């Protein structure tokens, strides 16, 4: 079971380019077993993790280049840990770092 502890917002698409956001995601994905994971706010809301009214998805895995756009693997963890899908990085509004406790 995950306990959600807010750390910080590390990317904001209103103030950052897709290239900058991709660079941040690649940096975090490169760290293995560091106790952190990422959640993102998307335009196509999928799961409300923290009850705050912010609709979030959890990002995990690698950055991929697919059909001319950067994408990342995402999994909705609250209801079905195995429910994975591709997220377009261009749809990300902001990225939050959480700590697994």
Positions of predicted regions on the chain:
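Short glycine-rich, low-complexity segments
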Residues: 1-58, 77-101
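Short aromatic-glycine-enriched beta-strand elements
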Residues: 69-74
């Amino acid at each position: 079971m995950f306990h959600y502890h807010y750390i910080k917002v590390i990317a904001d698409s209103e103030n950052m380019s897709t290239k900058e956001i991709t660079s941040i995601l690649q940096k975090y994905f490169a760290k293995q077993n560091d106790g952190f994971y990422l959640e993102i706010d998307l335009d196509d809301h999928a799961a409300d993790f923290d009850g705050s009214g912010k609709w979030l998805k959890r990002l995990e895995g690698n950055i991929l280049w697919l059909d001319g756009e950067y994408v990342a693997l995402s999994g909705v963890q609250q209801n079905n840990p195995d429910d994975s899908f591709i997220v377009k990085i261009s749809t990300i509004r902001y990225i939050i770092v959480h700590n697994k406790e």
